[in-house]
Curated annotation (Swiss-Prot):
It comes from Eliurus webbi. Heme b b566 binds at H97, H196. Heme b b562 binds at H83, H182. This is Cytochrome b. GO terms for cellular component: mitochondrial inner membrane; respiratory chain complex III. One of its GO terms (molecular function) is metal ion binding. Component of the ubiquinol-cytochrome c reductase complex (complex III or cytochrome b-c1 complex) that is part of the mitochondrial respiratory chain. The b-c1 complex mediates electron transfer from ubiquinol to cytochrome c. Contributes to the generation of a proton gradient across the mitochondrial membrane that is then used for ATP synthesis. The gene is MT-CYB. PANTHER family: CYTOCHROME B. Changing I39V: In strain: Isolate Eweb652. PROSITE patterns: CYTB_CTER (PS51003), CYTB_NTER (PS51002).
């Protein structure tokens, strides 16, 4: 008799995705972050659901309702900080996941990669709207500044901004719709994740060597389920330590002041995970140019499969491109630091140089390095 997990219509899908899935035998711990992102998403939906039970999306009561959650709801403080810091964990895993894809050439599975870019945009949109909900100073001014960027769009910009605001400024209508979108988007993300996995399982997973691994596959369970559980335990250890010992470490003190449209904070900045893009936005003096650079900073990832010049997929055997890759990582860390600094000398020029370097490495230096390496290895 066939095992039920192989014959039942529903269990069969789970079996082919997480149990009997043929997986390359040599994938390293860098491949753990896909499952960690799944755990983060489940955690965010669960904690978010409980927060939504007590939160009110009204400008007069939003800030008080968050305070009420922290003070009066049983373990409300824990749920709130798990949700806030869970977002940080989500982005750490996301950046590593994308970075691993870039390093090992996983972007050559174009459908999976493009789906991942759509997911990245969706998660960033969700996180931005979530940051607005507590209705602190940084929530209000962050929402005002970022939504205002759309006014740079020629002809329809101003109308578009007022349409998104639901009025002539960020107000009750804006907060209500942001809450509605923040609630629905994670469920859309779950659907997108399923499509992402569908595309992934069409071609199978890549591996560190970048070579075809059809001849050397092992079942996902028990080998990689155990490996993933270890990753999950380490992630939870890190998250719980952060929540219990330094819950406000990654937050902004300004967000503990209720939103006041008449008082602008000295430094308006987003959460740490958006600082690199914010630095690129600020480094261009022109408003429309800045907005385009901001969008392109993520969208440039979609060009990677078309900019791949080497005959080798992975960077494992490509020292020149490896060096460029780590310079790019250092450059992104520099941009993250600059995004949190005031707009003054020397931060302006550092931000501009780091922004130029970011695009130059991806669009010019990496493709050139690929060709040089092929030449040196006599692979052309």
């Amino acid at each position: 008799m066939t095992n039920i997990r192989k014959s039942h219509p529903l269990l069969k899908i789970i079996n082919h995705s997480f149990i009997d899935l043929p997986t390359p035998s040599n994938i390293s711990s860098w491949w753990n972050f896909g499952s960690l992102l799944g755990i983060c998403l489940i955690l965010q939906i669960a904690t978010g659901l409980f927060l939504a039970m007590h939160y009110t999306s009204d400008t007069t009561t939003a800030f008080s309702s968050v305070t009420h959650i922290c003070r009066d709801v049983n373990y409300g403080w824990l749920i709130r900080y798990l949700h806030a810091n869970g977002a940080s964990m989500f982005f750490i895993c996301l950046f590593i996941h994308v970075g691993r894809g870039m390093y090992y050439g996983s972007y050559m599975s174009i459908e999976t990669w493009n789906m991942g870019i759509i997911l990245l945009f969706a998660v960033m949109a969700t996180a931005f709207m979530g940051y607005v909900l507590p209705w602190g100073q940084m929530s209000f001014w962050g929402a005002t500044v970022i939504t205002n960027l759309l006014s740079a769009i020629p002809y329809i910009g101003t109308t578009l901004v007022e349409w998104i605001w639901g009025g002539f400024s960020v107000d009750k209508a804006t907060l209500t719709r942001f809450f509605a979108f923040h609630f629905i988007l994670p469920f859309i993300i779950v659907a997108l994740v399923m499509v992402h996995l569908l595309f992934l399982h069409e071609s199978g997973s890549n591996n560190p060597s970048g070579l075809n691994s059809d001849a050397d596959k092992i079942p996902f369970h028990p080998y990689y389920t155990i490996k993933d559980i270890l990753g999950v335990l380490l992630l939870l250890l890190f998250l719980i330590s952060l929540v219990l010992f330094a819950p406000d470490l990654l937050g902004d003190p300004d967000n503990y002041t209720p939103a006041n449209p008449l008082n602008t904070p000295p430094h308006i900045k987003p959460e740490w995970y958006f600082l690199f893009a914010y630095a690129i936005l600020r480094s261009i003096p022109n408003k429309l140019g800045g907005v385009l650079a901001l969008i392109l900073s993520i969208l440039v990832l979609a060009l990677l499969p078309h900019l791949h010049t080497s005959k080798l997929q992975s960077l494992m055997f490509r020292p020149l491109t490896q060096a460029l890759y780590w310079i790019l990582v250092a450059d992104l860390l520099t941009l993250t630091w600059i995004g949190g600094q005031p707009v003054e000398y020397p931060f302006i020029i550092i931000g501009q140089l780091a922004s130029i370097l970011y695009f130059a490495i991806i669009l010019i230096f990496m493709p050139m390095a690929g060709m040089i390496e092929d030449n040196m290895l006599k692979m052309n």
